[in-house]
C-alpha cells in the first residue's frame, strides 16, 4: 500500500520555497480483458479495481452493454462478480475494460509560485527529498511529474459611468487590477476550476483597497467554466480582449 498522501505532500512542500502546492496521487492503469462466463457470471480478481470505470461488452462487439439492464455488478473482498442478463444472458464470454489503482505507485505533482511549471531539475529535487529512507516506504515507487496546464483566454466587455470611467479602467485593466488579480488567483493552486465568476466578482466589486469603484456591469465571454482535475492547473494563455462602454447606470 502506498504511503499516506499527506505525508508525501508535506515533504514536497519542504523541498523548495518556490513550491506552493502539490498533489500525491496513486497511479492508475486501464486494462482490457476477455472473461469466461460460468453459470451466467463472470469474475475478475483484484483489490484495487475502480468499478465506476467498468465497461462491459459482448465478446467481439463494439457496443457497450447497459448496466442493470444487461448486467449487474458486485465487488467484495477483492473479487468483481458480473452477473449477466438481458442481451448478455446467453453469453459464453464478455469483454471488459476497467481501471485499477497501481498499489504502491505514487505520482507527485508540484506547482510553483505564480502557477509556474517545475522543470526537470526541480522535479529531481523533489524526488531526492521524498525518496529519503525515512520518508518513502520501501514498497513504494515514486515519480514526479509537472502539472497539466489548461489554458484559458479572457474576453470581456465592461460598463462604466462617465464620472468613474478613468478609475474603473485602472481598477479593471491597470497593473494589479481585476484582471491581474484574477489571473493570480486562478493559477495559484492545483485543481482550481476555471471560474469566470471569480473574474466577474473582481471587476464588479474590487475589494483590494478602500473605496474602489468597479464596473456596474460586465459581459464575460471568456473564460467559460471548466472543472479541473487535482493534477491540472489553469494558465492564462495571454490572449486578452478587453473593451468598455460608457453609459449612465440605471438604478
Where are these regions (language model features)?
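Hydrophobic/anchoring residues in structured secondary elements
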Residues: 21-27, 56, 73, 220-223
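An aromatic-glycine-centered, glycine-rich loop/turn in mixed alpha/beta architecture
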Residues: 165, 169-251
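Extended beta-strand solenoid/passenger and fiber regions
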Residues: 1, 5, 9, 29-99
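Residue-level signal for short segments within beta-strands and strand-turn junctions
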Residues: 58-60, 112, 203
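Intrinsically disordered, low-complexity, polar/charged repeat-rich segments
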Residues: 31-34, 40, 45-47, 153, ...
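A broad structural signal for short, well-ordered beta-strand segments within beta-sheet-rich domains
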Residues: 18-19, 43, 47-53, 88, ...
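A broadly conserved detector of short glycine/acidic/proline-rich loop/turn motifs that flank catalytic sites
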Residues: 49, 60, 148, 160-162, ...
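Carbohydrate-recognition loop of C-type lectin domains
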Residues: 2-29, 97-192
Amino acid at each position: 500500500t502506498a504511503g499516506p498522501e499527506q505525508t508525501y505532500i508535506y515533504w514536497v512542500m519542504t523541498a523548495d520555497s518556490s513550491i506552493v502546492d502539490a498533489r500525491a496521487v496513486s497511479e492508475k492503469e486501464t486494462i482490457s480483458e476477455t472473461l469466461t462466463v460460468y453459470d451466467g457470471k463472470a469474475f475478475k480478481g483484484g483489490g484495487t479495481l475502480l468499478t465506476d470505470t467498468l465497461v462491459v461488452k459482448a465478446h467481439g462487439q463494439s457496443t457497450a452493454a447497459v448496466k442493470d439492464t444487461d448486467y449487474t455488478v458486485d465487488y467484495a473482498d477483492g473479487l468483481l462478480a458480473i452477473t449477466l442478463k438481458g442481451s448478455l444472458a446467453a453469453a459464453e464470454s464478455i469483454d471488459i475494460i476497467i481501471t485499477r489503482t497501481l498499489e504502491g505507485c505514487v505520482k507527485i505533482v508540484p506547482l510553483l509560485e505564480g502557477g509556474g511549471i517545475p522543470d526537470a531539475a526541480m522535479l529531481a529535487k523533489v524526488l531526492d527529498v521524498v525518496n529519503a529512507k525515512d520518508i518513502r516506504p520501501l514498497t513504494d515507487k515514486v515519480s514526479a511529474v509537472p502539472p497539466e496546464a489548461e489554458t484559458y483566454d479572457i474576453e470581456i466587455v465592461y460598463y462604466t459611468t462617465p464620472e468613474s470611467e478613468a478609475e474603473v479602467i485602472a481598477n479593471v485593466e491597470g497593473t494589479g487590477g481585476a484582471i491581474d488579480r484574477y489571473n493570480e488567483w486562478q493559477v495559484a493552486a492545483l485543481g482550481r476550476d476555471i471560474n469566470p465568476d471569480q473574474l466577474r466578482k473582481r471587476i464588479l466589486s474590487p475589494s483590494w483597497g478602500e473605496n474602489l469603484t468597479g464596473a456596474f456591469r460586465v459581459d464575460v465571454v471568456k473564460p467559460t467554466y471548466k472543472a479541473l482535475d487535482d493534477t491540472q492547473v489553469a494558465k492564462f494563455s495571454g490572449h486578452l480582449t478587453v473593451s468598455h462602454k460608457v453609459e449612465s447606470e440605471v438604478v
